Amino acid sequence: MKKLLLTGVFKPFGVSDEYGEALCTMELLNNQVTREQGIHSPRSNNPSFGLYLMAENLEIPATVLDFPDWEDFTKEIRNGNYTHVGISFIVPNVLKVKRMAEYVRKHAPNAVIILGGHGAGIPGLEEIVDYDEVCRGEGVFWLRRYFGEDVDKPILHPVSPSAVRKYVYGAPIISDAGIIITGVGCQNTCRFCATTHKFEKQYTAFLSTGKEVFDACVKTGAALKVEDFALMDENFCKSPKRARELLVNMESHGKAYTFSTFSSAETIGKLGIDFLVRLGVKFLWIGVESKANVFEKTQGIDLHALIADLQNHGITVLASAILFMEHHDKQTIHEDIDWAISLESDLLQFMQFGPIPGTRLYKDYDAEGKLLKDIPWPKQHGQDEIWFNHPSFTLKETATYTRDAFIKKFQTHGPGVINMAHSYVKGYITVAREVAERQKRGMTWNAETLRYEETGNHAPDEFMKLRLEAMKRSALEFRPVFKAAELYAPNIAAAKKARMVAELYEATFGPPTLTERVQGLAVRGFAFVESIRAKDGDVMRQPGTIRHEWPDRHGAVPQATEENHWVRHREHKRPQTAAAASRE
Ligand code: SF4
């Protein structure tokens, strides 16, 4: 009987030791978006979604082990009787995988070791890790094929939250959301992009229709008691038919779900703001990359106007910019950093132009002899020093420029959470006004043209009423942080902005309720404790270990796992400093 373990790499994360680096924390926002924002930075870990999706869609019994510590992992190997052990990892974690594979060889010598994830593209991987099989692309179909199962069976979507161990200002107040993995890959073929190359420049849909996406939302929503979802897809709206069907399904069922997702700028323009608002998009990650407009996806688009329009309609924007591109020298890099900040996105990622194995950029730089091959893999994460020769910067300078870019954004626009709150309340005001105006003018939504059109029908837009309620809920989640944001603001302008946003909330939603006032006081208390801890260095908490088993499903009617295993995973109750985590 075959039995598969699917595991991520072991913790601690974000700790400098022989396997990893402090600047690689396994936290998306804190690591590379709200970096340098101290206690204002939202903290969370995203589960290894792919592992759950793969386990859900196999017939053989499978176990997922996410965020294990070394003891969890070794115990699982010793006691699990696994015939196959799959390890998913990114490039900087390859030395952890090496240690894990060595342990498997010793304690489960008959187990087949399968590697996958973005780290699987490392050239000469076999010289680092002792493994048997490698999946360099999409995993669900690869594993079905590998185990001789029916590749064409429908895809079942697992229930999973988008993040665990969530807090800001040290307070566990970030609300839950589900994750919906609609597809992987992107056809835009940007030269540096690991995703497009990993999936061979093709898009693979797991949920091809709007109905399938809606059903996955219903299932996850019921299990996790959420109405908010992250759509894991590089460019969800690039499949407009599916997005339109999703909206039709939500409208017919009276469900005004909200979504966070990724989109290229060109796609947003094609669908239009009215559609995005109606669909419930509340957070967009957009690759703006560089002022030099070197990528097709941003050419001819007024990004300043686009981002402002999104924010004015309640869609918070995370813009992503790239440092140390070929055209950057000591003057143009400052121009690009200033330009990226001038976009006034709520959040701003700075990522280094890193040649990641498997990408065209890596091949080009390898051929040109630009790669610095003696730089260890754990250092190749894009937030410290670059790992290639750049004619205008020393390695040390690249670390400093990167850090300083984040500091400049923080000093210029203040905490990201306040920017997001501002966009949510502005959006609520705008959309409420537009809904009222349209009713007055007798305008109704045309699902074909994706526009509001004058029809003489003055009936209220019932779905937009639900949408406004959902927008209000999204906005009010931020209310407890205002005072802490003001008290610990990085400068006077940021403190003023926190006050201004709090006043705008009061004018829009009325004075805070008793519950909101108590929550605000609690966040201030948490923030005080967090600020003391932060004085000793960054406060690094480790995610709890998540373990879930899928039974043998040979011959079973395909049925998604309904059990909400997310309430059962073991969490570390107390926050840990980086040093404590390292000792663990
Ligand atoms: S648009 Fe984004 S996901 Fe697509 S190839 Fe470019 S960087 Fe990658």
Predicted feature residues:
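Acidic, low-complexity intrinsically disordered segments
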Residues: 2-228
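Radical SAM enzyme core and accessory elements
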Residues: 2-28, 77-83, 110, 385-584
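Flexible glycine/acidic-rich beta-alpha junction loops that bind and position SAM and/or redox cofactors
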Residues: 13-16, 122-125, 241, 323-331, ...
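Alpha-helical structural signal in soluble globular domains
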Residues: 57, 103-107, 130-131, 245-253, ...
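Residue-level detector of anion-binding/catalytic polar loops
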Residues: 61, 112, 282, 316, ...
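Structural recognition of alpha->loop->beta junctions
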Residues: 125-143, 273, 278-284, 335-350
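Radical SAM [4Fe-4S] cluster-binding motif and immediate context
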Residues: 163-318, 323-325, 331-334, 338
